[in-house]
Design a protein with these regions (language model features):
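Conserved PLP-enzyme active-site core in the AAT-like
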Residues: 24
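Gly-rich Lys/Arg/Thr-decorated short loops/hinges at beta-loop-alpha junctions or inter-strand turns
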Residues: 1-3
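Active-site-proximal beta-alpha core segment in soluble small-molecule metabolic enzymes
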Residues: 5-8, 15-16, 27-105
């Protein structure tokens, strides 16, 4: 029987890929990589940190996914893919929305 499978993420390849995309689309195009669902199981925090410097926004599905990125000081603002009906004024996400750190679809 084989042991549990392992996925190794090559962060240098992520850097190279985002640079290649940037070269193809040019500096005027705004990039918004999707890091929802824990970056599809690859680890949203570390993937988001690598993508953030070259991205205008990082797309997440839910408010909780955005909170995770905010708590870990990921520099790019988040774009919610999930419809959001309301945010409480005292909520961290409400403050981030006012400050441009969160965007709604």
């Amino acid at each position: 029987m084989r042991p549990t499978s392992v996925i190794r993420i090559d962060l240098a390849s992520i850097d190279a890929n985002i640079r290649a995309v940037r070269r193809l689309v040019g500096p005027a195009c705004r990039l918004c990589p999707i890091v929802k669902a824990d970056a599809y199981g690859l680890g949203a925090r570390r993937i988001a940190r690598r993508l953030a410097p070259a991205s205008h926004l990082l797309a997440v599905y839910s408010p909780m996914q955005a909170v995770e990125l905010l708590e870990h000081r990921v520099s790019a603002p988040s774009l919610f893919l999930m419809p959001v009906d309301s945010l409480a004024r005292g909520d961290e996400l409400y403050r981030a929305l006012l400050g441009g750190g969160v965007h709604l679809t």
